[in-house]
Amino acid sequence: MTRGKLITFEGPDGAGKTTVLERLVPLLQAALGQTIVTTREPGGVAIAEKIRQLILDVSHTTMDDKTELLLYIAARRQHLVEKIMPALESGHLVLVDRFIDSSVAYQGAGRGLDKQAIQWLNHFATDGVDPDLTLYFDVPSELGLARIAQNTEREINRLDLEQLDLHQRVRKGYLELALENPQRIVKIDASQDLESVVSAALAAIITHSQA
């Protein structure tokens, strides 16, 4: 059986990638005619969801940056083994809300941790599994945070409470990743209206599937 494809959705907080992912599922099923598995990080499976609660709890204000990184990576490992790899081995298209690039952008560019160490730890945890395609939803930090503040249905987490400068560093980190990985990462202007963003994301995935 042909291995499935892994497509990751990345972006700073408030970029709208989660909403776009949800909107894409029926469109992709109609266009590609294959089983689609959607999941998220941190989380996706029971153990990783418990780790997610630890990481994002607003009361955990004293969490060390390296502790945060290692918790994300632990959740990623369990998620990969328990959900992502079985789906890929079954030939499914797997759409993941955040993956390795989030660690590089948030804990690397955002927190200032060593990027080479982050990449090595992720390589170790994932056995070298990389996305086939990454959609990066770019939005100015001010707009992203304004969207979060206006979204009454969103549960505020610990990272949402960080200062603007951290979110700006995260965005810069993502933009650097996009420049360094032009064959894998497709940058999408997420400041557009939702329909335009969904259309751009759909076109990128279909183009990749036909390559």
From Swiss-Prot:
Disulfide bonds: none annotated. It catalyses: dTMP + ATP = dTDP + ADP. SUPFAM superfamilies: P-loop containing nucleoside triphosphate hydrolases. GO terms for biological process: dTDP biosynthetic process; dTTP biosynthetic process; dUDP biosynthetic process. Keywords: ATP-binding, Kinase, Nucleotide biosynthesis, Nucleotide-binding, Transferase. One of its GO terms (molecular function) is dTMP kinase activity. It comes from the Bacteria. ATP binds at residues 11-18. PROSITE patterns: THYMIDYLATE_KINASE. InterPro entries: P-loop_NTPase, Thymidylate_kin-like_dom, Thymidylate_kin_CS, Thymidylate_kinase. GO terms for cellular component: cytosol. Its EC number is 2.7.4.9. Transmembrane segments: none annotated. Gene3D superfamilies: P-loop containing nucleotide triphosphate hydrolases. Belongs to the thymidylate kinase family. Phosphorylation of dTMP to form dTDP in both de novo and salvage pathways of dTTP synthesis. HAMAP family: Thymidylate_kinase (MF_00165). This is Thymidylate kinase. It comes from Streptococcus equi subsp. equi (strain 4047).
